[in-house]
A protein has these predicted regions:
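Short acidic, glycine-rich surface-loop motifs adjacent to enzyme active sites
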Residues: 167-185
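N-terminal secretory signal peptides and thylakoid transit peptides that target proteins
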Residues: 1-16
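A short C-terminal boundary segment appended to hydrolase-like catalytic domains
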Residues: 257-329
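Extended active-site neighborhood of metal-dependent phosphoesterases/phosphodiesterases
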Residues: 81-169, 193-210, 220-264, 268, ...
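Residue-level marker for buried hydrophobic side chains located in beta-strands
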Residues: 37-39, 70-72, 99, 176, ...
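N-terminal active-site segment of His-dependent metallophosphoesterases
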Residues: 22-85
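Short, well-ordered beta-to-alpha junction loops that form the rim of enzyme active sites
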Residues: 140, 177-182, 217-218, 289-291
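Active-site glycine-centered loops adjacent to acidic/histidine catalytic or metal-binding residues
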Residues: 42, 74-75, 102-103, 179, ...
């Protein structure tokens, strides 16, 4: 059973809104314009039976909201021919679009280079300007020399040097995008080291230049402020993972027969995404989407591994955040 794009868009009308108050220093404010962009994370085409419809609903909503650009935050799809129709949905967007590399985008034996080539990415980490704001995309999939097994989750020395140089050679307000969180313990394993670079940029600028850092990966709806920088975890578009011990059927049997990985998830009835507006007069707004669980929730399944995690919910919710943007004297 598939929800239609119209069903998904109807659910999006119940979106929450987060308002961030800010004040830009005069030396940068003159070059800023209102910026509107859409952000989705962890669609997981290779798990979800209705990933194409979910992605299409997101893009249709962003078109109606007149977004300047859209971004997907990783764990998008494996770079293989079977996913070409899904890629075509993504590439149907007529404006600017940006990609972040997730760890599961290399499942099936694919490399980062394979994924980048599949989506037309020159590099896994890069920077771009939109309406006077500088976006910095990081690749959290480096592997350091003494890394344990499992998926790599590191920002290497070369990339950190590039980040430092990019921040020191520019003056614009900054938004950071990375798949794995820089503050979650199961995110980037040297997240504190990367955060220190961002904090140093704020100190050098004399104001809260790094407006926010957005990530996906954890399938959580959460926000934590660390040393004046908000770290926003954008929930998965599709589900929360509950694993083998809590596998169950949320959809009709025929759906699970064709898409067996869904049984390890608690799916969201509607696709989740965030719509962000940055107003040069001094306001950052995050609109989200509220949905519901398909079948039992993780709590109803007795899922214990996530009992201490914040943000296990089928929503991208409203939040109130205060940013100190005034230039220090």
């Amino acid at each position: 059973m598939k929800n239609t794009r119209r069903d998904f868009l109807r659910a999006a009308a119940a979106a929450g809104v987060c308002v961030v108050s800010c004040r830009f220093p005069a030396k940068v404010a003159g070059g800023l314009k209102e910026l509107r962009f859409g952000m989705c994370a962890d669609v997981h085409k290779d798990i979800m039976h209705d990933a194409d419809e979910r992605l299409g609903a997101y893009l249709e909503c962003m078109t109606k909201k007149d977004a300047h650009f859209v971004v997907q935050m990783g764990d998008f799809c494996q770079p293989k021919k079977a996913n070409d129709s899904f890629r075509a949905v993504w590439q149907s967007w007529e404006g600017d679009q940006y990609n972040v590399v997730g760890n599961h985008d290399m499942d099936g034996g694919f490399s980062r280079e394979d994924f980048r080539q599949y989506l037309g990415m020159e590099k896994g980490y890069y920077t771009y300007l939109e309406q006077g704001y500088r976006f910095i995309v990081l690749d959290g999939n480096d592997r350091h020399e003494n890394a344990p097994g499992g998926y790599p989750r590191h920002v290497g020395e070369k990339q950190r040097t590039w980040l430092t140089e990019t921040l020191s050679s520019t003056i614009e307000p900054v938004v950071v995008l990375v798949h794995q969180s820089l503050q979650n313990a199961s995110g980037v394993d040297n997240g504190a080291e990367v955060r220190a670079i961002l904090e140093a940029a704020n100190e050098a600028a004399g104001w809260g230049r790094v407006l926010a850092c957005f990530s996906g990966h954890h399938h959580l709806d959460d926000l934590v402020e660390v040393n004046g920088i908000p770290y926003v975890q954008v929930n998965s578009m599709s589900y929360y993972w509950v694993g083998n011990s809590k596998k169950h059927e949320s959809y009709p049997t025929e759906v699970h027969a064709e898409h067996p990985w869904i049984q390890y998830t608690s799916p969201y009835a509607d696709p989740l995404w965030a719509f962000v507006t940055i107003d040069p007069k001094g306001e950052l707004r995050i609109e989200g989407v509220r949905s519901r669980w398909v079948g039992p929730s993780p709590a109803e399944l007795g899922y214990e591994e996530g009992k201490d995690e914040q943000g296990i919910t089928p929503n991208v919710t409203a939040r109130n955040v205060s940013l100190q943007m005034k230039e220090r004297g």
